[in-house]
Structures are given as structure tokens and as C-alpha cells.
Amino acid sequence: KAPAPVLRRLFDKSKFAISTEETRYYLNGVYMHISDSEGSKVLRCVATDGHRLARIDAPMPEGAAEMPGVIVPRKTVGELRKLLDDDDMEIAVSVSETKIRFATPDITLTSKVIDGTFPDYTRVIPQGNTRKMEVDASDFARAVDRVATVSSERSRAVKLQLDEDRLVLSV
């Protein structure tokens, strides 16, 4: 079982990166699996469209240690989201190799999972960074928004350069 707010956060923070490309169908969902993070087990959701990657962790729910990794389809994520508004609700999650079930006291949502292998997303995440910076999320979002307005429609890229005491955004 997992609290509704935990599942809501996992899917809300990862769904923006779900691919809509039909040729790489295995990217058309959120990869939900148990992983190690700094010495403890976590429930991790990952999504990517090949350009953006979202990875979000939550404490591993009791009894989930043997859960197989599954790719939850985009449509299922959307339908499930409608069930997760009650903060006091516990969601019973059952997973097999081919299906996933989310059950509330009143509603059960069962879905096939995507039959495919999610790519090794850890290979694209830089390791051993010597420079790190913490920024206020809302200030950062506003700055990216301002710079993105002058980026080209084709690339929509915003470059980040970390200097000694500041972060410079450019197109």
C-alpha cells in the first residue's frame, strides 16, 4: 500500500517527460521500480522522451521490495491521477509482469503494462560532479521562462553555465 499523496507526487513530477513517439513505445509511460538511493531502497518513477528525463523517488512502501519494474502507460497515469486527490487514502498497488492494479476502497484500476525494456537512464545522468548549486525552484523557473521566450522554436534549448558564485542562463 502507498499513500495517495506519495503516488500523486511521483506521477505528477514525472509525467511531463513521457514520450508520445510511437516508434519507441517503451518510452510511452512511466517506469516504476524499486531502486537504491544513498543506501536505502526507494520507489522510483522515471520518464523520458529522449530529450527530457524525470526521475523522482519516494520511500519504498512496505512489502514492495520484490516488485518487478514496470512501465505504466501514459493513459493509465492520466486515469490514475483522477483517483489520487484524497490525501487520506491508501492505494493498494499490485504488480505482475504484465499488469498493474491500483485499488482504493471504492475503485480498482487495472491496466496492462508496456511490454518492453526501459533504457538504462542512469547512463545519461552525470556522476561525480565537483560543482553543485542549490537554487530556489520558483526563481529558477521564472528565469528559465524569461530566457526561453527568446529561444528558437526548433531547439527551445536554454544553456546553463555555472560560474563561481552564480548561474548564467542563455540561449
Locations of regions flagged by a protein language model:
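Structural preference for solvent-exposed beta-strand-turn elements
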Residues: 1-171
